[in-house]
Amino acid sequence: MDTSLISIIIIAIALAMDAFSVSLTKGFTQKNLTKSQILYYGLFFGFFQFIMPVIGYICGTTISSFVSTVAPWIAFFLLLAIGLNMIRESLDSDDEYIMDTFSFKELTLLAVATSIDAFAVGITFALLNMSLLLPCTIIGIVAFIFSISGIFIGKKLGNYFGDKFEILGGAVLILIGIKILLGY
């Protein structure tokens, strides 16, 4: 399946919503982050959003020959599950991401946790026999930009919008899954 650039950008934005939400939280809970620490957030989130679809793709290619006839259904259910999980997590009231100080350990855990969805999208890319470099690069760049932007916006706006962006990201992934399913 040849996915258009617009679809790839939409997927990247949807995947970046978790990192954006976490970054918003960091912005309004850690007012003392330096510019270099903010840059680390962007780099870590961007890198893991880039690499996890690659890992998912590698895993997906090992099974794609067995499931090529059901690939659209698998893609749909993967994106549906990811989207619903993002929405469910956003409706939970606990603020699991809030911590008081900057640490690379925490940053790595947050970057991995927010990129698990990208791993599943990588499996979907493999099942749909998509190219990998352009989508992963766009996903990483968008996550980088959204992470840094989220921190700056969070510093200015506070806690009000965090969960709503994650709901939007989940809804977009579900809609993309439906689009993939209807395209076959």
UniProtKB/Swiss-Prot annotation:
This is Putative manganese efflux pump MntP. It is found in: Cell membrane. Probably functions as a manganese efflux pump. Keywords: Cell membrane, Ion transport, Manganese, Membrane, Transmembrane, Transmembrane helix, Transport. It comes from Methanobrevibacter smithii (strain ATCC 35061 / DSM 861 / OCM 144 / PS). It comes from the Archaea. GO terms for cellular component: plasma membrane. The chain crosses the membrane at residues 5-25, 38-58, 67-87, 107-127, 133-153, 164-184. InterPro entries: Mntp/YtaF, Put_MntP.
